Amino acid sequence: MRLQYKTTTKYLFFSLPFYLMLFACGLQITDVEYALREAGENRGELEAVLSHYAKLDDRQKLEAAQYLIRYMPYHTSYDKGIEDYYHAIDSVVALSEDKLEQEKHIESLRLRFESKYKQKRDIEVITSEFLIQSIDEAFKQWRECEWAEHLDFEQFCEYLLPYKCFEGQPLTEWRNAYYDICKGDIDLAYLCDEYKRNPIFAATEVNNQMKNTPQSFGLLKTLPIYDPDIILKLPFSNCATYCLGAVLIMRSKGIPVAYDFTPNWSTGNNGHSWNTVYTTRFGNLEFAPHTTDPGTVHYPYLKVPKIFRNVYKPNEEYLKIATEKYIPPKLRNMFIRDVTAEYMPTIDIRIPLQESLKSGQSPFIAIYDGNNWTPVYWGKIAGSHVVFERMGLNTCYIALAYDSNGNAIPI
């Protein structure tokens, strides 16, 4: 995580910001020119995508292409060498049904393949053919698939449009590759008025198929895995990995599913991840893949200070902090959106500053995890106060400032 953070920060420091006004089919695309310059020698591939949709006179597809390109400079992906690691795991699982034996060999593979995991900036390697195909497939899901037709354009851009679901995911044709995994009878939903156009049915049907795969929760040390077929074969894994697999499986079918998480429970030393499906009437309904279905309240007896959703668009507040100041390791993820208020009543916590923060210091709010004070969100300076927005209730907090070396100072 620290290495990835430094790399991202380097790009933010040395890519000088500028604003150039361009118009394509009457659309203002200021930030797109910044992205095109960041593409370097790959600029022609991205311009080909914009030109393609401008000639088609499809305003929405052109806007979608601009959306993806605008934020692409911040994204990186593993190259296809990652697939050798997947094949090795598949071979290990096929050789033995003993989960402990599988664990031993899978963890040994991590050390063997770690040096082969190479990340590249999407903006520098993505091809026009791949991006056009991905955009067209996403629009087909939105315009023709019953599970997604209730999404507006902004929601479509968040749930279905992105050419990948997670940071690091290789640039592959994942929708077609994963469509048949755990699909159950969703293709027959058109036969029943209660099921067609019902994303709750679709997510539940797929989740029921996932429940039929033998999953166990535990600590298995692996390199990042973005292939749900491999995830389903692991002897055991954690909630984050299973939720990642669920997003890939369900979005490949046009089901608007997201990955939500809390960095830390209010009274515990761990965070947690789960999924949500965006419904036609009830907004987002959470569920745990392999375990519970949409509409089942997830851990209602546990308090959370903050809940985030994994998204494609980088968090602007995060970027402002990351370019100049220290961010604690647990919060080093720019691709998040605060959705705490979707789950519970929240409060803006306003704390007076006894003295101004020094240059390079940034405010964070933390909870006690039983051992240490763990930061869960950043704050904003408002005059002589610091404000922490949309915080969960019934939680004990402390306000901290971090200097550039990562030292915490109570405010």
Residue locations for each model-derived region?
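Hydrophobic/aromatic-rich core segments of domains that either
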Residues: 31-33, 54-55, 189-209, 218-229, ...
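Secondary-structure boundary elements
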Residues: 48, 59-234
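A short, amphipathic beta-strand motif
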Residues: 347-355
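Short, ordered, surface-exposed loop/turn motifs in non-cytosolic proteins
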Residues: 356-372
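Short, acidic Ser/Thr/Gly-rich low-complexity loop/linker segments typical of extracellular
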Residues: 371-385
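Short Pro-Gly-centered beta-turn/loop motif in secreted/extracellular proteins
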Residues: 385-405
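Edge beta-strands of extracellular beta-sandwich domains
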Residues: 405-411
